[in-house]
């Protein structure tokens, strides 16, 4: 059986880790790394075997994402976005559009992204303000999306729009280069994950063939949980990102403690309080990774409470990551505050954890509703 984590970890150590500081410093999308990710075949893992892919599932999706995030959170997040958009397309898309997208991924090394957040509604991505004018063979769209990961680099963008009055919930797949589609890269100046290029996306009189409409038929697609499969993959991916990031914070803080010398040949690691902090970091990383593995295993087995486990794992990884980042800075001290070493970069990356959709507060609310038998939506 293929070890997806090891495969991705070896790639990450060779092709991502050496460039993590540069990605953060320049704040640019790591195109060369993503070209290598595509060439190595990582974007193909969710493609069904009948299309020539590996037919992998949520566990493998999380394992690869975590390994990439251990190199830099930017790589993990941008990778997971592509997988989520692909999973949605494979689940709900018509054969024509599935074949087109799969061919581009398999033969042309393309990848995808999500475009759902908006300026007015923020993380409430199901409440789109997009304007869609439907015609017989095409539709005209006007509107904007606020923070689009991999903007200007992904080849397809999955956008949310208001439900169709006749056919119900729908997303659209927007090919890069569509007339009327623009990105504002100058508006991206992220505190952390600076290589995401999560800039605004504008659509002005954008004309799309109606084949790019992906209608959400939950019954036909056999959706077993209260939200669609793409949301579940997204939460698993974010859990993996912050699990990987938390693991790297632990390793970086431990390395600093072992290498920081005092007179008398002692190190920070010889101080009892610092040992307690390092132990705390290990605990955070271990708990997050254990929760991720348990939740994705439950989802792979379609266990009844798998959705609650995925959400709880996401909350755990997010809060543990932020806690570890703060503790890592305490261990790093003045050197970390002066941006010597990776700990200050890792802290900035971690601060995205509690606020990304679905936010920690939203997730806790959802878990509470489900375990008390209330309607989620």
Residues of each region from the PLM?
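Residue-level recognition of alpha-helical structural elements
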Residues: 1, 26, 30, 97-98, ...
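Buried hydrophobic positions in well-ordered alpha/beta secondary-structure cores of metabolic enzymes
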Residues: 12, 64, 141-143, 203, ...
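C-terminal helix-coil-helix/basic helical segment that borders enzyme active sites and/or dimer interfaces
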Residues: 20-24, 286-316, 329-337
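Glycine-rich flavin
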Residues: 29-39, 43-145, 149
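A short core secondary-structure module
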Residues: 144-183
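Glycine-rich beta->alpha junctions and the first turn(s) of the following alpha-helix
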Residues: 190-285
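Amphipathic alpha-helices that form helix-helix packing interfaces
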Residues: 239, 246, 253, 281, ...
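Glycine-rich phosphate/cofactor-binding loops in nucleotide/flavin-utilizing enzymes
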Residues: 334-377
